[in-house]
Amino acid sequence: DETNRSLLSVIDDSRLRLPDDLDIAPDGRIFFSEATIRYEMSEWAVDALEGRGNGRLICHDPRTGSTRTILRGLIFPNGVTICRDGQSLLFAETWACRISRYWFDGPDKGKREIFLDNLPGYPDNLNRGSDGTYWIALLGMRTRTFDLAMRKPGFRRRMAKRIAADEWLFPNINRGCVLRVSETGEIIDALWDEAGENHPSITSTCEHKGWLYPVS
């Protein structure tokens, strides 16, 4: 999966359709997510309803100019952050409601495992705090109705064909939440805006010198 067509081209898709988040490894390699190779940002809801692994994780090495896909078949991969060990990273899959860990160096190179699963909402960006814990922004909370729809592909197909797009079921993105998670995947704390009045749809949060900065 390498090509020299341009710095940010990969062989299985000459154009980056929806790059999302990135982080830089200690050796300068850039790891970034492409949320979907099928849809534009304005069509995010279609990707959510499709529920397929249309996304991928990509590595660009400035030293060689190569760009390659390292993981594919991901369900709207979103936030990416390098772990403290400098050999692995965490990435969010928004519609799968999970965080995974991938080792790009070291003895476990190429290994992928679930870090945090069955989250109560849809993870967006994630960042490592000054104490080594991770801050995960949930852009919205899951509902039983949408969860049920995601288990029924036939229902989703009929809905898309017979109902106007502005009346489709959508993920709930009107309630903000931020999770603080340990290096082992244990949820330490959760900050909520249950009414969605002050910080609805939190997409990212960063900690700096003890202060937390949410973005919505």
Task: Name every feature range the model reports, one short phrase each.
Residues 1-216:
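Sequence-structural signature of mature extracellular/luminal beta-sheet repeat domains
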